[in-house]
Amino acid sequence: MTSTPTPTPTGALALADGSVFLGHGTGATGIALGEVCFNTAMTGHQEILADPSYAGQVVCFTFPHVGNVGANGEDEEAASPQARKAAVGMIARAKITPPASWRADTTFEEWLCTRGIVALTGIDTRALTRKIREGGMQMCAIAHDAAGNIDIEALKAAAAGAPTMEGRELAADVARTEGGDWTEGNWTLGEGYAVGPEDGPRVVVLDYGVKANILRLLTGAGARVAVLPGKASIDDIKALNPDGVVVSNGPGDPAETGKYALPTIKAVLDANIPTLGICLGHQMLALAIGAKTAKMPQGHHGANHPVKNHETGQVEIVSMNHGFAVDGTTLPANAAETHVSLFDGSNSGFKLTDKPVWAVQHHPEASPGPQDSFGVFDRFVGELKGRVEA
C-alpha cells in the first residue's frame, strides 16, 4: 500500500508492515524511528507533542487542522531540559498555516524544528488511523528531505527493524538528572503563572517524564513541590521529609522502568507515605502491589475519553495517553478499582484499602483536555493537609 500526494513529496512514512505514505515534509529534516499512534484531540497539539510520555512515538492527529495557532512558551509541558525529548514525529492532513492566535510567539513549523520533530502533512490520516485501529500500533520510520531524496526501500527496512515498545525503557531519557524545588503554580489570563506557597504539605514528585502541568496543579492545590529523578533512592526521598509522594507519568514499558523504580516505590509504600500515581506511575504502583500490565493494541490517546468514577458514580471526560494498561483482574484484594474506561472497560484507577495510596491511568492535569479530573490534585493535597494538621 502506497499513498501519494501531489506535487512532489518531500516526506514519507513507512510502516513495519511495508505500507508507505508519501507527503510533504515540515519541521525537522532527517529520519526518525518510532511507534505510530493516533490522537483524537482537536486542540492542544503543542502540549501533546511536548508531553514526555510520547517519547519514542510518532503522533498521527485525526483532526485535520494542526498548528494553525502557532506555539508559545507558556504552554510548555517539558518540566526539565531532558523532558524536551518527547514525540519524534508528527503526521497531519492539512498544511500548517501561519499562526492565527495572539498568544503565539513562533510558528508551529519553527517550533517543530526547535524540538527536532520530523513532521508530514498531506497524509491520508483517516486511512492511517483505520490501519492502526484495525491492526494495532506498529513501528515506523518517518523522513523529511527538502529535495525529496528519500530511499523508500531503506525507510521500509528501517521501520521493519525498529525495536517495539514492549521491553523498552524510555523514562530515563526524559527524566531530570538533578532534583530541585518547583514553584510555578496555576496560569491565569493576564497574570501568567502564580508563585507557589511558602508553606503547606511537602510533596516529592518522582520524575519519569513528568508533565509541567502536574507540578503546577500540585502547587496550585497548596503543596510545596520538590522533584527528584526517577532513579532516586528511598533515602533521597526521606531526606526531604515528604508528606506525600507522586509517581509521575512517563514513556515506555512500565515493566522495564520498574526494574530500577519498583524497589524505591515499594519502600515508599512500606513507609506508609501517602502516594499518588499518574499514568506510568499508576502502572508502576500496580506492579509494586503485585498486579500485571500489558501492551494495548491501539492504546488510548486523546482528550475526549469517558471514564466512570466508581466512587462518585459520575462519568468524567479526561485526557489519556498510554499504550500499556493495568490488568484490573490482577489487582490484589486490598486494591479497589476506582475508575474504568467506558471505551473498552480497561482499568483507569485504583486505591488501596489499607494504605493511603491512589492511582489514575488518565491525565488529570489535562493540558490539553477537559478539567473534569482536576479534583484529583485537590483531594490528594487536601488529604495531606488533614494529616499534617492532625
Swiss-Prot record:
Pathway(s): Amino-acid biosynthesis; L-arginine biosynthesis; carbamoyl phosphate from bicarbonate: step 1/1; Pyrimidine metabolism; UMP biosynthesis via de novo pathway; (S)-dihydroorotate from bicarbonate: step 1/3
Residues reported to bind L-glutamine: 53, 250, 252, 280, 283, 321, 323-324
Keyword set, alphabetical order: Amino-acid biosynthesis, Arginine biosynthesis, ATP-binding, Glutamine amidotransferase, Ligase, Nucleotide-binding, Pyrimidine biosynthesis
Domain (Glutamine amidotransferase type-1) ranges: 202-390
Active site: 279, 363, 365
Substrates-to-products reaction catalysed: hydrogencarbonate + L-glutamine + 2 ATP + H2O = carbamoyl phosphate + L-glutamate + 2 ADP + phosphate + 2 H(+)
Family recorded in the similarity comment: Belongs to the CarA family.
Quaternary data: Composed of two chains; the small (or glutamine) chain promotes the hydrolysis of glutamine to ammonia, which is used by the large (or ammonia) chain to synthesize carbamoyl phosphate. Tetramer of heterodimers (alpha,beta)4.
Protein name as it appears in the record: Carbamoyl phosphate synthase small chain
Lineage: Bacteria, Pseudomonadati, Pseudomonadota, Alphaproteobacteria, Maricaulales
Gene: carA
